[in-house]
Amino acid sequence: MTTTLQQRSGASSWQAFCEWVTSTNNRLYVGWFGVLMIPTLLAATICFVIAFVAAPPVDIDGIREPVAGSLIYGNNIISGAVVPSSNAIGLHFYPIWEAASLDEWLYNGGPFQLVVFHFLIGIYAYMGREWELSYRLGMRPWICVAYSAPVAAASAVFLVYPFGQGSFSDAMPLGISGTFNYMLVFQAEHNILMHPFHMLGVAGVFGGSLFSAMHGSLVTSSLVRETTETESQNYGYKFGQEEETYNIVAAHGYFGRLIFQYASFNNSRSLHFFLAAWPVVGIWFTALGVSTMAFNLNGFNFNQSILDGQGRVLNTWADVLNRAGLGMEVMHERNAHNFPLDLAAAESTPVALQVPAIG
């Protein structure tokens, strides 16, 4: 009898935990994806803060030239970063127990892998948690679909690009200046500005900003007045009210006359779908572009493509961009013995003039 009661008590405790995890009445929804998200994002955040403040220099290139990224080694908020793991580690999984000592783990940039892997698992779980909450509330699943765009971008720079280049040392550093350095090196090595997927991403981000500003200003300019001249118009809205808070007909008429009739949406649902889809698709293409350039399927090359009647080169902006890329490539290679191959002007000298006969 005692054993039976203990089993029922244990079962009821587990059932209570399951109901709490999946309850939509909590102030913050947890969900089963949240059970995975919370510890992974906490681990990533704690390790990032400690490494950003106090991590020792990391031998990022694997040539015994450590790069300092933490605050206590002289960096500030702008220049500081969690430096990627060493090129000597390559793509190997490098947890703490794989190193001979904690000092070795820190010297080879182990904290970077710890932060990135926990962060990626955390944002994947956050996306799943968005779907889970939508499912529990009977909503459609497009919120997690929209969130998949930044998730794809983070996966591209932290996971796919290192896989394509053969080392986690090529991943994006976790810092402001490190991000800029990553962008400059990416342009130098892959000519990303001439890649059509990057162009689509720029159109998505800037176009989304433009459309968001246009939509917000149109709505704000066509609010239905419910207050006096001396009160804020925001007091004219009550949460959950059934009436429209702005006059979509007036906004449609204004914008249709400002541009042309068919440039304005007359359907609020299709309008908001467009506002969501435009930047999401653009960022998807950017992530896809970074993922293809990870395997050296680079941007277009129009260098020295225009010649005059005598065969002399007429420089274009493509040539200016190429010269800038060469300069960035030189600055990127800190060690002289690893001179970039695409800058070598002379023919390589063979080690052996002829293959020796065997036997």
Curated annotation (Swiss-Prot):
GO BP term, example = photosynthetic electron transport in photosystem II
Instruction: Note how many cofactor molecules are bound and how.
Output: The D1/D2 heterodimer binds P680, chlorophylls that are the primary electron donor of PSII, and subsequent electron acceptors. It shares a non-heme iron and each subunit binds pheophytin, quinone, additional chlorophylls, carotenoids and lipids. D1 provides most of the ligands for the Mn4-Ca-O5 cluster of the oxygen-evolving complex (OEC). There is also a Cl(-1) ion associated with D1 and D2, which is required for oxygen evolution. The PSII complex binds additional chlorophylls, carotenoids and specific lipids.
PTM: Tyr-161 forms a radical intermediate that is referred to as redox-active TyrZ, YZ or Y-Z. C-terminally processed by CtpA; processing is essential to allow assembly of the oxygen-evolving complex and thus photosynthetic growth.
List of residues binding Fe cation: H215, H272
One GO MF term: chlorophyll binding
Quick one: which residues bind pheophytin a? Answer: Y126
Q: Which InterPro entries match?
A: D1/D2, Photo_II_D1/D2_sf, Photo_RC_L/M, Photo_RC_L/M_CS, PSII_D1
EC assignment: the record states 1.10.3.9
Question: Where along this sequence does the record place binding of a quinone?
Answer: H215, S264, F265
- What family is it from? Belongs to the reaction center PufL/M/PsbA/D family.
Name of the protein described by the UniProt record: Photosystem II protein D1 3
Q: Which organism is it from?
A: Parasynechococcus marenigrum (strain WH8102)
